[in-house]
């Protein structure tokens, strides 16, 4: 998984893909039901995954919030994830009886169809707060592909010793991925440049470019795209939608 994740850093959209996500992978969403401020109803979560299938998305990272206000325990999230993944695979099997879904990541054997279940993974979106620092010290984290940590800050101000904390993350063997940097309007170009020089990866929210978070964030997103600073794209979905997932 780690080597695969390294490869997709520079992977282009698959030929013939109808998905608006560059590599058919959503690296950031809140679809796992009932664990944060995202989806609450498992049926709505299943409906969203069906929309993902139809949109050409092929892989999804569930990244529920972990922060002092939402102190999710990794082990509890793993239990919820495994239970929901089983529900999804059962739902897929009912919709595609010609396929035999099997395996921990939804691998399948197909006879007369190209239908494939989504590959589902669990990580977390970590607020850089005191809870995170304690869990970083204890090694109690949910990384993407073993070595990448999706992190965020307040949209109003960075944490104290922000870059020092990022360096401590790296010293623990992780590469930080900063979620939606376009939303941190306290940052200036030199701040972004310093983070990139530090080896921090950037994840763009799909809907930032479409104005979902306001004109200032949209403008900042365009600037970061122009500066070629983004490494990943995620939806950051919290509610059911089909808008903008398939390429026009």
Give the ranges of each region predicted by the language model.
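Histidine/acidic-residue-rich catalytic or RNA/ligand-binding cores of hydrolases
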Residues: 188-195, 213-222, 227, 240-248
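Short acidic/histidine-rich active-site segments
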Residues: 65, 230-245
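A structural motif
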Residues: 57, 229-230
């Amino acid at each position: 998984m780690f080597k695969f994740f390294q490869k997709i850093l520079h992977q282009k959209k698959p030929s013939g893909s109808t998905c608006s996500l560059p590599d058919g992978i959503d690296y950031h969403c809140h679809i796992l039901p009932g664990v944060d401020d995202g989806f609450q109803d498992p049926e709505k979560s299943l409906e969203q995954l069906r929309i993902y299938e139809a949109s050409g998305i092929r892989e999804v990272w569930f990244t529920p919030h972990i922060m002092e206000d939402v102190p999710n325990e990794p082990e509890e999230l793993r239990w919820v994830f495994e239970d929901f993944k089983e529900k999804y695979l059962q739902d897929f099997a009912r919709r595609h009886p010609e396929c035999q879904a099997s395996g921990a990541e939804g691998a399948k054997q197909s006879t007369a169809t190209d239908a494939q279940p989504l590959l589902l993974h669990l990580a977390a979106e970590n607020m850089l707060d005191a809870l995170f620092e304690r869990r970083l010290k204890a090694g109690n984290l949910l990384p993407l592909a073993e070595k990448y940590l999706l992190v965020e800050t307040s949209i109003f101000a960075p944490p104290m010793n922000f870059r020092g904390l990022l360096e401590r993350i790296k010293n623990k063997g992780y590469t930080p991925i900063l979620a939606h940097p376009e939303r941190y309007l306290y940052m200036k170009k030199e701040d972004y440049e310093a983070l990139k020089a530090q080896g921090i990866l950037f994840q763009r929210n799909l809907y930032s470019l479409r104005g979902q978070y306001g004109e200032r964030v949209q403008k900042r997103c365009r600037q970061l795209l122009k500066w070629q600073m983004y490494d990943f794209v995620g939806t950051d979905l919290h509610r059911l939608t089909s808008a903008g997932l398939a390429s026009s």
